[in-house]
Structures are given as structure tokens and as C-alpha cells.
Amino acid sequence: MAIIKQGILGGFSNKVGSVVGAGWKGIATMRSLPQSVANPRTTAQVANRSTFAQLAMIGSGILPTIIQPLWNRWAKKMSGYNEWLSVNKKLLDSVGNVVDFVPQAVFANGDLSANATAGTISSAGVVNLTFATELVNAHDAATDEAYVVIAILPQGSQQLNEGKVFGFATGVARSVGTVSVTVDQIEATDKVYSYLMFRSKDGVYRSTTSFKLLDNA
């Protein structure tokens, strides 16, 4: 039982509702008890947490090479990482499965153009992407710098965390028309996905995301 000794504004001891009264060095103190928070584990909630965790794992792996340079400047009231998570989580929720999500994944969401036209993989794991050099939009420039993401998923995989994702800030100019990156963890049966983005040399503009499924025969 709680005892209030000096009226409602005075000192008291023990528990009153969700508040506990006590004393510390002769000073009357009050503290609230922690709320009992349920941790629901419905099928939908478990699935939601799983997809969020998978996206977070991907994002953390490409944070310095892709997300920071292509998201931080444009994020509003949150970090670039959190905005990237938010955009892709909504997209994954809307399409409902990994197979349909992967070709639509967003690694940059800006005004510059990006158009990957072809891609090959060598036996040594070198991925070569060819891209259009035409200046399509008002802010496109020959000096725009290429960014590349390579995603690898085992054949038939339905989980993002079963694969690997690599990000590259290549520094290769749009005018070059081709870029090469090395990924030495590609197995013969893997599905290999590439994403091409650009950022202006002064960092003011970023492009859309151009997706290309690579032939891993």
C-alpha cells in the first residue's frame, strides 16, 4: 500500500498506479514504472520485421559507397540510409516478393539519366557494363560519375539475405561509356543483377537507377 505523507505534492512511498515514491539523500522522488509492452508475433508482423532486417543488411554493406553519396544530400528529416530503407521497404511491400522487387530496387532517385545498355561477366569475376553517353536531361554532363551495385542471389532464392550485394563508387565519367568492377564471389548458378547510377561531379545532382540482368552462363 502507498502512503502519501504530505499531501499530493509531498513525499510518498511505495506504488501509486504507475508511479513509485521514494527518497534519495533526503529528497522525495517519484519515478514511473516501465510500461508493459507486448511484442506481437503475428505472421504479418514477423514478415515485416524480416524484410526490414534484410534491407537493413543490404544497406549497411553499401553505406559508404552508394547510400551516403547518392542519398545523404537529398534526405529530408532523416538520414540518407533511413530514406533509402523507407523507399525500398515501401516498394518491397507493394510488389510482395523478392523476385519482382529486385529489378525495381532503387539505389538513386534523381533527375539525371542512367541507361545501362549491356553487361558481361568474365571468368575472373569482372563485370563490364556499357552505358549510353548521350546527354538526355538538362543537367546531364559528360563528367557525371558512375556508381555501380552488383547483387548476387542463388538460383531460386526468395530471401535477400541469402545473397550478396556490392557497391562501387567508380569515378568513371559518363563520357567513357563503359565501367568495370570486380566481384570474385560469383558462382556459376547465381543470378547476377546490376544497377547503374550517376552523380554530377560537383555532387549536386543524382540520377535514376538503371537495372540490367547479367548473363551468367
What are the roles of these predicted feature ranges?
Residues M1-A116:
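Long, polar/Ser/Thr-enriched low-complexity segments
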